[in-house]
Amino acid sequence: MAIAHFSASIVSRGDGRSVVLSAAYQHCAKMEYEREARTIDYTRKQGLVHQEFILPADAPKWVRALIADCSVAGASEAFWNKVEAFEKRSDAQLARDLTIALPRELTSEQNIALVRDFVEKHILGKGMVADWVYHDNPGNPHIHLMTTLRPLTEDGFGAKKVAVIGEDGQLVRTKSGKILYELWAGSTDDFNVVRDGWFERLNHHLTLGGIDLKIDGRSYEKQGIDLEPTIHLGVGAKAISRKAEQQGVRPELERIELNEERRSENTRRILKNPAIVLDLIMREKSVFDERDVAKVLHRYVDDPAVFQQLMLRIILNPEVLRLQRDTIEFATGEKVPARYSTRAMIRLEATMARQAMWLSDKETHAVSTAVLAATFGRHGRLSEEQKAAIECIAGPARIAAVVGRAGAGKTTMMKAAREAWELAGYRVVGGALAGKASEGLDKEAGIESRTLSSWELRWNRGRDVLDNKTVFVMDEAGMVASKQMAGFVDAVVRAGAKIVLVGDPEQLQPIEAGAAFRAIVDRIGYAELETIYRQREDWMRKASLDLARGNVEKALALYNANARIVGERLKAEAVERLIADWNRDYDQTKTTLILAHLRRDVRMLNVMAREKLVERGIVGEGHVFRTADGERRFHAGDQIVFLKNETLLGVKNGMIGHVVEAVPNRIVAVVGDRDHRRHVVVEQRFYSNLDHGYATTIHKSQGATVDRVKVLASLSLDRHLTYVAMTRHREDLQLYYGCRSFAFNGGLAKVLSRKNAKETTLDYERGKLYREALRFAENRGLHIMQVARTMLRDRLDWTLRQKTKVSDLVHRLRALGERLGLDQSPKTQTMKEAAPMVTGIKTFSGSVADTVGDKLGADPTLKQQWEEVSARFRYVFADPETAFRAVNFDTVLADKEAAKAVLQKLEAEPASIGALKGKTGILASKTEREARRVAEVNVPALKRDLEQYLRMRETATLRIVTEEQALRQRVSIDIPALSPAARVVLERVRDAIDRNDLPAALGYALSNRETKLEIDGFNQAVTERFGERTLLSNVAREPSGKLYEKLSDGMRPEQKEQLKQAWPIMRTAQQLAAHERTVQSLKQAEELRQTLRQAPVLKQ
């Protein structure tokens, strides 16, 4: 998971530092240090990914001329030399240097966009120069950002201290009348603002990337987590350690020991209360898997037995609820890990949603028609849509939401709404996660605003509390995490106030991040800006306004009067009519979409629509593409929908595309609208989350605009869903429904006017927690059928487990606690004797089973065999995905007896697993009978393919397990510490090797027998762990580059530092051993030559 490292230092001459040296190091460049007339060369340093040197928008001409036509490193060199020349003091402070960890969850391009966003908002906006570089060391992506401490002026640099200006615009003075000054940059308050700004932007970009992760920059203590903070051992600290070691003192060792003591203390705390790990994870993620748990434990636990015990205790914690079991993906055969959440998180979100529904039913904050009319009179430039949105949020309900893109007029609309509320006697305040967003709300809309954290702090202190005459406006609501959103909703409920949520359409997409905002608006509905401008007919725009105001019946009447509503007796007939009309109206020059609420309807409509196009020859049968939901066929002309965000492709969940080229498992599609069209190449092995896009769900269409829309109405619709479905079009919309089913439920208008639909259409479990969990999972895009089955099965398993308690668990844990000293009084710790030079890797972030699963999923031979299996399923069964789930392949893989029984059943009674393809009987057509014959013929072949796959998987599993265990055994080997005498010998050997005096090197090594034996043992350990000749090549001269990355893979930071320190000694030892082998080989060759010379020769 991402880490929250953000540190700052001042580059000061008093500390022996130079800003030019720092710049050269960070840019991995060669620079001239003009002050000392010397050259600094760091061009051999590796890891530079990206670099930028940026001036603020109002930078003076001299600095622009200074860096004109320079490279990034050249601009940095020129500017910082100018700073060095300007500062005259011997202890001058030259720049502020920030080191910031980047999230590994984002790609390099996403991280660059994140840093640019942060720099623009929090550095350049304050008039500072920003010199930043992106380094991507293995497992440690980070940036270095240097900023100026003086403002730029027209003739150079300004003063470091500036006069403080009061709120009245006047200079602030002390009691004695002196002007009060503050640092222009570099103060503690300034650091805190910049730091908070970084974490706000970081979480914003994680959410944009569809990543369910929130990074909290506060300390563990402030977060309420009972753990000790560990110490960051930076580059400077490690340099001090090396220097101290050369001098024979060990100050840095105390720091490392203190860090290890804190890790041990954290281990003890986790052992006593494993729920601490859940607290850590749930502050970042709402849904997690076992690897997330392992990553947290890996920070604190070294002992493999303790690690496994804690993994078990955490996953089996009563508070943890499994939402989805480990499963096999039908399309690829790859393992999908189990997904978990906590009961507390599920209840928190469910409580928040219930409170939101309760607020929507309380009509206490109405603004009168007269007040609204007066407000609209003063704001004559408001559009009809903005007026409709104001009427919506100024309605009597105590909660409302509005959605619109940037530039859609939200600020203008909120300014007018604020005036209306104030005229009606309400106090209007606002907040946002980011200080910049809250500042914009304050300045542009006139709404008194603070950050959400600031509001929480003030309320905790009893200041500026809400009351029943307050309206709270939350901007960028989609960026707010569930816990924080729940807190604000609860505060509004208790105070009798009203809350208005403002969000962006992208925040409605069904991805894991941002679920709190969706959980609310899915229930209460929202007003949308930029909706009625889509429709080109006046009467359609009027109908859209009616829908926005909740007047569904009026909107339906308008569409009915214009013959746009089609009712058939049965739903199946309505579907047939919809497809027939769609086929008749189909025009490749127009964008079209079929919308339905239920996934099964969408799947059916996609199949039927494509069949019509194939019949007409508009698209061909197409080529096979194995999607995440099974096999599909795509051909040039097909319309597709992307189902997952992918930055590398530039596609988002719900985006529509059109295929222009297709081959097996590869397509080229066009995405974008009009002037923004571009081509996207989709390879199945890299991206498989797509489907035919002729029809899609109403949820996925949120924020979309197309020319023509056809809607299939179902009884699961409500007022909000109807509003979304009937406002996606520009030119035309038609709605189809089955009259009989709607008549039984009060008619079309009554069903579509309902305030909200049922929580869920599933009722697998009457318990409230289970219904809440299903809704929770649905908000995050999980398959709720699988979630329901998983929870029911887990509940049954839990019931059965209670009958067979594990009696020795308590004894084992007690013994473990005694071994770790949990039951004993603290003892004075002493230095460990002969600590290893490089400790072995004893714990791993994933289990052997996890690694095996990953490698099995990537095995090309297994993949090919799985393609045979899935192809046979499609030959045999009418619905292969359903048949595959019925086989319960997880059990087949885990239990040989179960596998045998399933295969026998498959061969004897294939129809018991799923409906076979085709039909038999006198009513079956020739094509259907042929399909049934092919299906029956392929049943034995399917059994054989499955048996072959299981055999191959078992063989591959044994091989991978053996290799992985051998690898883990190898990397767990400790490289022993050397005695002072052995170290001295190897240092002399290294000097001799550097002089190319190898005989002398060997002489040093053989001078003492005991030392030679110690070096041989040391070399044996190095060989067993890293290989006999690994450190002999030229690329092994320095501990850097790909070789170092490979050898340090899986190590903790302190172990990587041990490896760097030990690298020269280990390399020397291997060079010595290699020279010994050469000498020995030459000696043996000479002995052989002498023997051959001395052998008698028989003459004929």
From Swiss-Prot:
One of its GO terms (molecular function) is ATP binding. Keywords: ATP-binding, Conjugation, Nucleotide-binding, Plasmid. Gene3D superfamilies: 2.30.30.940, 3.30.930.30, P-loop containing nucleotide triphosphate hydrolases. It comes from the Bacteria. Pfam families: AAA_30, Bep_C_terminal, MobA_MobL, Viral_helicase1. ATP binds at residues 404-411. CDD domains: DEXSc_RecD-like, SF1_C_RecD. Belongs to the MobA/MobL family. This is Conjugal transfer protein TraA. The lineage of its organism: Bacteria, Pseudomonadati, Pseudomonadota, Alphaproteobacteria, Hyphomicrobiales.
